[in-house]
């Protein structure tokens, strides 16, 4: 962790931007821990700097200074440039001490820092992006984060054609992690008519133990600690709340997972319909990994006529195949364009 603090300072100096460090092991067991570095626009760390991170982490103690010099020279880092690093952590017992080690690494190289304390990983990504865009993306505070998301949700909800209490209730498995703390806070920003019920909220039970998004995805069944009735809307976070998965049980008790393949298919179909409506010839494509459901691939290619591209397994490969600055920018750019062209009916 100390060394990742050092690396974050070098990356900040090289990019002349704020860099984020998140202490978390995501969907892994509570006793594990790890670190994620966040690049200037809230995106994942550049692949070349992942290599630097690996080299630095594995360097012998007596070779540490030489490793830092080598990275600085290879990446053309101006060591006289100011550096600023923002830090967040999840709720694991070890996270606070480890984040202190990150801070030690930042300060030993003369970097400045802001410790946000307990955050979800998406919240830290947001903070980094806000700080590096002069506030254009939003206010780099927890309140700013909640306000931005809740405002967008309220506006989107106005266009939804749903009715009845069943459509206003969501049960959330928080994996006994940071997602519970932050969702409790965010509930105050959401409409009163929306019922968000929290389960596995950290008051008892261990992080990611028989619960959480990875458990649900891997075992294809509901998490422990949540009671599901037929057709109730349910979802699960992972340990640092940067992963979410939706599911429900039908009237016969069969479990149904609304996974990424299904969501990607729905979104691409929706965007394609909008493009056809305004007569645009833009092409919408979908990127999948080798673990993708083969039926979804065939449906997209053969029925929807949407091109599908395959990349290596892992979110970083899905991220870096996109020729835009940060995750979701391709989608958001298209959506913004469509919103300007189409008035919702």
PLM region descriptions:
Residues 1-7, 31, 40-41, 53-55, ...:
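Phosphate-binding chemistry for phosphorylated carbohydrates and sugar-nucleotides
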Residues 9-17, 60-84, 153-166:
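Glycine-rich phosphate/diphosphate-binding loops that line cofactor/substrate pockets in enzymes
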Residues 19, 78-80, 113-117:
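Short, flexible active-site-proximal loops enriched in glycine and acidic residues
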Residues 19-30:
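Hydrophobic or amphipathic alpha-helical targeting/insertion segments
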Residues 25-26, 77, 275-277:
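Short, flexible, solvent-exposed loop/turn segments with mixed acidic/basic and small polar residues
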Residues 34:
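Glycine-rich phosphate-binding loop of ATP-grasp-fold ATP-dependent ligases
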Residues 37-50:
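A charged helix-plus-loop insertion that forms the helical arch/lid used to bind
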Residues 87:
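Non-catalytic, regulatory and substrate/membrane-recognition segments associated with hydrolase enzymes
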